A protein has these predicted regions:
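N-terminal beta-strand motif that seeds the catalytic metal site of vicinal oxygen chelate
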Residues: 1-22, 129-180, 233-236, 286
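An N-terminus-focused feature that recognizes amino-terminal "leader" regions
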Residues: 2-61, 68-71, 76
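Vicinal oxygen chelate
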Residues: 9, 16-22, 75-119, 176-180, ...
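Amphipathic alpha-helical segments
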Residues: 21-35, 90, 178-194
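Short secondary-structure junctions
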Residues: 33-39, 98-99, 191-196, 255-263
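Conserved short beta-strand elements that form part of the metal-binding/catalytic scaffold
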Residues: 35-69, 119-126, 193-230, 270-273, ...
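Active-site-adjacent scaffolding segments
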Residues: 43-57, 61-103, 110-126, 130-137
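A mid-sequence, solvent-exposed acidic-amphipathic segment
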Residues: 165-191, 195-199, 205
């Protein structure tokens, strides 16, 4: 498998600990239009077509999602502007609230939260010819007003609504204590490059993409370190093309002093300074 934009990684899934599995499952199916791919009494895997995107795990912990570092938002990438318009119209006509919208120069994005406060971005990428790509490979992002009415009017009303089959996880944006420290950590461990940085946030990517990961410290310096079973991000999944990439990531994480756990011969997790877990696995098709 060859990844888009000459990337060496692929964002696969976000795995969330949730306090009310039934209500959250209803949100992701009825509001977001994802399908249930597998289900037990304590876990639900949801996706687009046959591709898992969001994995929900029941937790008995009661902390608020935003009381700890972890997920800022998971960014779900629609294959076209028309597909973004369809999901926009569907959610808007259900009167479910959006918390923001923006034209970022390289993408058009809508923002909302699930029922427990996990951030979600729905976006579509503009053609690469429209991106502000600098000579050094950096890709400048902006935050400008979205042509929301134009996009909404493109939307087709379909019942029952199902999100476009080619939808996938586009990037993961993390809430961290120190964005510069976190950015340097992920750049080294996952071999990502700085694409755009401000004092409080950083956007980093593999290859020529605008960002696969972002980190920001907008939540402040006093949030709790993530612990097992806390509501919110349990971990997110990154895929690599071969076993050699996996071994190299483990070595670089160890060199940074990160705790690395091998889950199998083809999968591992590592933990950053804020307790955020990244799971990396070899692509099963390779």
């Amino acid at each position: 498998m060859t990844y888009d934009y000459k990337s060496k990684i692929y964002l696969a899934e976000a795995v969330l600990n949730v306090k009310d599995l039934a209500r959250q499952t209803a949100f992701y199916t009825q509001i977001m239009g994802l399908g249930i791919l597998s289900q037990t009494e304590t876990e639900v895997v949801l996706g687009a077509g046959n591709k898992p995107l969001v994995h929900l795990i029941q937790t008995n912990h009661e902390q608020a999602v935003k009381s700890s570092y972890g997920l800022y938002h998971m960014a779900i990438l629609l294959p076209s502007r028309e597909d973004l318009a369809d999901v926009f119209k569907h959610i808007a006509e259900l009167d479910y609230p959006f918390v923001g919208a923006a034209d970022h120069g390289y993408s058009e994005a809508l923002y909302l939260e699930d029922l427990e406060g996990n951030g979600i971005e729905l976006y579509r990428d503009k053609p690469v010819a429209e991106w502000d790509i600098r000579e050094d490979g950096r890709i400048v992002g902006v935050t400008e007003e979205l042509s929301a009415q134009e996009i909404y009017e493109m939307g087709r009303k379909v019942e029952p609504f199902v999100i476009a089959e080619e939808t996938r996880m586009g990037h993961i944006h993390l809430s961290v204590k120190d964005s510069q420290l976190a950015s340097a950590f992920y750049q080294e461990v996952l071999e990502l490059a700085d694409k755009f940085t401000i004092p409080s946030a950083s956007w980093i990517a593999s290859g020529d993409y605008h960002h696969h990961l972002a980190v920001n410290e907008w939540g402040g310096k006093n949030l709790a370190k993530r612990e097992e079973d806390m509501p919110g991000l349990a971990y997110y999944i990154v895929e690599v093309e071969d076993k050699g990439d996996l071994i190299a990531i483990a070595e670089r994480a160890n060199n940074r002093g990160a705790e690395v756990k091998w889950l199998s011969s083809n999968a591992l997790t590592f933990e950053d300074n804020d307790g955020i877990l990244t799971r990396v696995r070899k692509n099963i098709n390779n």
